[in-house]
Amino acid sequence: MNQKLVPVNTAGCYIPGGRYAHIASAVMSVTTAKVAGVKNIIACSPPKEGVGAHPTIVYTADLCGADVILNLGGVPAIAAMTNGLFNNPPADIIVGPGNQFVAEAKRILFGKVGIDLFAGPTEIGIIADAKADPEIVAVDLLSLIHI
C-alpha cells in the first residue's frame, strides 16, 4: 500500500478578521498550502470599517506566501474563491474557520469545491487550582487569543 500526494492548483484561505485579527488562521492556512506546493493561494479577509482588511492579516498572509489577498469576508468571500472571481482561478479547496454563515456556505458548496471542515468558534477552558504556576496558566489563557 502506498500514498501519492498531489497538490491542488488553487487553495482559497478564509481568514476571519471581523472583531479580531485571526493571524494564526493566516499562518495555518496559507503556510500549509505553500508547503504542500499549491500553485495559487488566494486569501480573503473581511474589511474593518474605514481601514480595509486588518493590516496584520494582510502582512501575515503576504509573508506566508499568499499570491492574492482579497478584502472580502463572509459568504461573498467563499463564493468569490469558489467561482474564481476577480480574474482569479477557481479554488479547488476552501480552508479556514468562520462564523455560522461561512460554515453554511462551505457546507452548501462541498462537492463543487473541497473543504477542510466546518469550523466553529474557538473555545478554551483552563482548570487550575491554588498550586498552579500563574505564569503557565497565563500562557495557557493566551494560547488562542486573537488580537
Per-segment meaning from a language model:
Residues 1-59:
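Conserved small-residue-rich beta-alpha loop and adjacent elements
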Residues 63-140:
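Conserved NAD(P)+-binding/catalytic subdomain of aldehyde/semialdehyde dehydrogenases
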Residues 145-147:
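Conserved small/polar residues in nucleotide/adenosyl-binding loops
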